[in-house]
Amino acid sequence: NLMFSTEMGSTADGSMKIYLRPETAQGIFVNYLNVQKTGRMKVPFGIAQIGKAFRNEIVARQFIFRMREFEQMEMQFFVRPGEEMEWFKQWKATRLKWHQAMGLGNEKYRYHDHEKLAHYANAATDIEFEMPFGFKEVEGIHSRTNFDLSQHEKFSGKKIQYFDPELNQSYTPYVIETSIGVDRVFLSVMAGSYCEETLENGETRVVLKLPAALAPIKLAVLPLVKKDGLPEKAEEIMKMLRFDFRCQYDEKDSIGKRYRRQDAIGTPYCITAVSYTHLRAHETLANL
């Protein structure tokens, strides 16, 4: 059983057995008509959400790749019956482009089409990323047919069909689902950006080559030395930039060590405050 069970109630005798959700999707299905009506939406339309999910994994392993509690982003896209395969192909391509746009390298991604389908699906594929331990799923795209909505309708006894004004008829929509493990995407970014460089003296150092769009610190402002008015000039630069970029100011240790610290956290740009004297000295040495 993949679902975690627990009890709800103030006393043991009066408690009720409940289950933690293994996916976020079902909350969307039971509320889709409310969202459709209040948002005045027409098929095709999608509803997306992010939240916690829980699965009773027998073996939780590979760092944060497989956990019993994890963050999930899902979208349910409601379409007319008979049009689901066309939309499935479109979302399959769109979702791959989204992952590739992160800039980790297109060759690190691939599709894995399912040969054996779940009971609710008529098509399914995974987007896999090349982790240090092989290609692993980071997102699943599924054509769930109308199974979920039909089951909710059957067991609730309440009609939850959509009225299509263009066709002038009611029907149970088919659903294309995209499901992402947020922790897995984070792991793919870290794994795809982590590098170790070997120096001439045999030592190794870490460089986090994050794509600039994903880097938490966009730039660092560094005075070359802690004198000659350079810290004050660097702070002026910092004040000009901090409202537009997430910046970091650092004046401790040598300039080389400060560059190394920024390399280790994936900062794409560094601005170094130098004086005219330092520039002239550098130019003189370069010409020797």
Short names for language-model regions:
Residues 278, 285-288:
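Single conserved hydrophobic/aromatic residue that forms the stacking wall/gate
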